[in-house]
């Protein structure tokens, strides 16, 4: 499916429209084009966000190469962990604050996805009549939104729960310090069942471990 969100930052009520488009993959492109036309959004800037299953994110040591060669060097560095060939992979990196890993040296987060998936998303957006600006990942989007919604000089935490998984982001001063997949499966059906109490306790333990790491190991307490 596709989550279609229309936002007007200049408006008193920025969120204009939100809906989920659920259909077969072969019909989604047509559905999106129809909704763009119905909402008179043709030509509006669009910021596409990849679904979590469309990419992998991993923490890596920054290679000692010129800035322009970092992405390609990291791509080769993580080749054995990729679910696709090097030729089929698209890898982008973003910095982790130096204060987060003083002992290890400079670290980066590397996001890897199939080139073909990038092309699919690009064509989907353009064929619907939208003006594609970027194709991003959820971590970057959450970071940007969180910075607009709350003061983060002391640190911000965001728990993203979907598809039975939970990912925690710890941010400070507009930068991601920690992105961690929590070792706890969460399903909406569990929240109303007897098993929720034990699942909730495991979730609390995982969260506390992450907060302790942020405060003690990263020195951000």
Predicted regions and their residues:
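Hydrophobic/aromatic-enriched cytosolic interaction surfaces used to assemble or bind macromolecules
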Residues: 1-221
